[in-house]
Amino acid sequence: MTFAAIPLLQRSLPETFSDWLSPLLSDRYDPHLVPGNQKRGLLIGMGMTEKQGGSDVLSNTTRAEKSAEGFYHLIGHKWFFSVPQSDAHLVLAQAPAGLSCFFVPRLLPDGQRNGVHLERLKDKLGNRANASSEVEFFNACGWLVGEEGDGVRQILKMGGLTRFDCALGSHALMRRAYSVALYHALQRQAFGKNLVDQPIMRQVLGQMALRLEGQTAFLFRL
């Protein structure tokens, strides 16, 4: 998600966090719990989904109230909060002019923790190593990205690239699985022949290769 957020944040990162751009572009992972401008690399997550609406984000109830200092206070929840260990999240919340996108850091510029409370991690099926959580916002500080009421269009700039990253990840797993299967078939013998020389196994490997090449072509079209 971090790389998917970079094009949006390069154009629309709130001025308060302009010194985050350098670590945002880094390929380093920095686990330290310090403000983003003090890190060698950053993680960026996303918070859209709420329990009452699911994928219908227009029904979100998390609200954002503008403060005298120019940032917003977020009050509400997210049912799925992607990459909860991130240094900041892009979060959808209802502002006076409609659903808007906010940059919500884990730590405030002065180093204090933001009002983002992780409730629990999701017990997911599949990609368990990529954590998701439930979260509550208690007057969490968020900075507007773009304009009020333009939240869906803004966050989908990140969402579209995130889906492309997911497709690349799936393709990588397919290619790895095919490589392992082919290597095994080249080494393993049964009934006096290597498996790769057995007609049925050749058919299975051929089908795997065709599916893999089809997805490769599809990714290049994307």
Regions found by a protein language model. Name each.
Residues 42-48, 73-75, 115-120:
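Short Pro/Gly-enriched beta-strand edge/turn motifs at strand-loop
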Residues 163-222:
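Extended amphipathic alpha-helical segments enriched in small hydrophobics
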